[in-house]
């Protein structure tokens, strides 16, 4: 049995990653998932979080992935998300400003914008955390 499987991370703008990996950790609304080669076929929603994977050469990699859908079929996994970026592509200053804007919107108490502000806050915090890890 092969110990790797194909991972594709796709956003509306571009393909972020396409290669073989040994394992991946990602989050859905229930918790943290670990996916290994030959995993059962499945589809799950994902939440904005830091995704960690080990590539075929054994290198550990991390990136921010916003909410989306993960599909596993015939030893191939595709993550479709609104946005995804490795630490090198994250502008820390921009992420911190986004966090401040989201916090301000939450304090204003506009019910319509509350969920959007909470999601924006989560995305900015995860981006900041990833950037500070590296």
From Swiss-Prot:
Function: Produces ATP from ADP in the presence of a proton gradient across the membrane.
Location within or outside the cell: Cell membrane
Membrane topology: Peripheral membrane protein
Subunit structure: F-type ATPases have 2 components, CF(1) - the catalytic core - and CF(0) - the membrane proton channel. CF(1) has five subunits: alpha(3), beta(3), gamma(1), delta(1), epsilon(1). CF(0) has three main subunits: a, b and c.
Cysteines paired by S-S bonds: none
Gene: atpC
Protein name: ATP synthase epsilon chain
GO MF term (any one): ATP binding
Main location: membrane
Family: Belongs to the ATPase epsilon chain family.
Coiled coil: none
GO cellular component terms given for this protein: plasma membrane; proton-transporting ATP synthase complex
Classification via Pfam families: ATP-synt_DE, ATP-synt_DE_N
Top-rank lineage group of the source organism: Bacteria
Gene3D superfamilies named in the record: ATP synthase delta/epsilon subunit, C-terminal domain, F0F1 ATP synthase delta/epsilon subunit, N-terminal
Keywords: ATP synthesis, Cell membrane, CF(1), Hydrogen ion transport, Ion transport, Membrane, Transport
